[in-house]
């Protein structure tokens, strides 16, 4: 059943960690959870052009620390930091805590599954041939060091009368192997023929040590962890 489950949820606590990192009692939990949802909705809406892959929310004592992982940090920050100041104020309106906004640059967006899926979805909306978009994404990921990649596109592809699912894979993508560093992303293309779903799995090697923070270290450019190359 490894193919049915979300690869990120399956690996939480092994080589992935949660995007909301805080603890609250019963009285506060519901309110804070709703705040997280509203903050993420706001940021994804305001930063559509900033290639945002992840939003991590931490809540140290009486603070709300929001870390935005983006391939275009300049778009988030704006001229002389004007845009990020506006964002901070809007996030502060949602939560009663002091807000701290951090930006983390994604240096290789071609290896981030969420960004790859969104890129393909945008190309489908511009009527680029889906096979060409998939093949281009696969070649870019493999060229930059991915061990394997799989892309699924489903819906009325190319305006076909009957919806179908097409997929393309290169290398190996071991979904059952818990130590495998598998990134997963989903996006939806809103075309004139209806919606098309895009799913992307990217395998980046195996992590041999138990490290729930492995993903954060990878995005920060820390490749010091032991890793076994795929055979």
Swiss-Prot record:
A GO molecular-function annotation: structural constituent of ribosome
Ranges where the KH type-2 domain occurs: 39-107
Source taxon at top rank: Bacteria
Alphabetic keyword roster: Ribonucleoprotein, Ribosomal protein, RNA-binding, rRNA-binding
PROSITE patterns xref list: KH_TYPE_2 (PS50823), RIBOSOMAL_S3 (PS00548)
GO biological process entries: translation
Pfam families, sorted: KH_2 (PF07650), Ribosomal_S3_C (PF00189)
Listed SUPFAM superfamilies: Prokaryotic type KH domain (KH-domain type II), Ribosomal protein S3 C-terminal domain
Gene Ontology cellular-component terms listed: cytosolic small ribosomal subunit
Subunit structure: Part of the 30S ribosomal subunit. Forms a tight complex with proteins S10 and S14.
Functional note: Binds the lower part of the 30S subunit head. Binds mRNA in the 70S ribosome, positioning it for translation.
Similarity remark: Belongs to the universal ribosomal protein uS3 family.
Name of the protein described by the UniProt record: Small ribosomal subunit protein uS3
Organism annotation: Nitrobacter winogradskyi (strain ATCC 25391 / DSM 10237 / CIP 104748 / NCIMB 11846 / Nb-255)
């Amino acid at each position: 059943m490894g193919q049915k489950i979300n690869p990120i949820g399956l690996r939480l606590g092994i080589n992935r960690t949660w995007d909301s990192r805080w603890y609250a009692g019963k009285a506060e939990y519901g309110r804070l959870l709703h705040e997280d949802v509203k903050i993420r909705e706001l940021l994804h809406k305001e930063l559509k052009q900033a290639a945002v892959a992840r939003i991590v929310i931490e809540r140290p004592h009486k603070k709300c620390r929001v870390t935005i992982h983006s391939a275009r940090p300049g778009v988030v920050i704006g001229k002389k930091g004007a845009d990020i100041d506006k964002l901070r104020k809007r996030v502060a309106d949602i939560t009663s805590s002091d807000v701290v906004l951090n930006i983390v640059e994604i240096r290789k967006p071609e290896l981030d599954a969420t960004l790859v899926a969104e890129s393909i979805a945008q190309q489908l909306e511009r009527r680029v041939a889906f096979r060409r978009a998939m093949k281009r994404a696969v070649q870019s990921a493999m060229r930059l060091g991915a061990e394997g990649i799989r892309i699924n596109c489903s819906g009325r592809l190319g305006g076909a009368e009957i919806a179908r699912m097409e997929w393309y894979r290169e290398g190996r993508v071991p979904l059952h192997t818990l130590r495998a560093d598998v990134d997963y992303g989903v996006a939806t293309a809103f075309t004139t023929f209806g919606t098309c779903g895009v799913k992307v799995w990217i395998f980046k090697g195996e992590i041999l040590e138990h490290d729930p923070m492995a993903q954060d270290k990878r995005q920060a450019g820390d490749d010091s962890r032991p890793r076994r190359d795929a055979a």
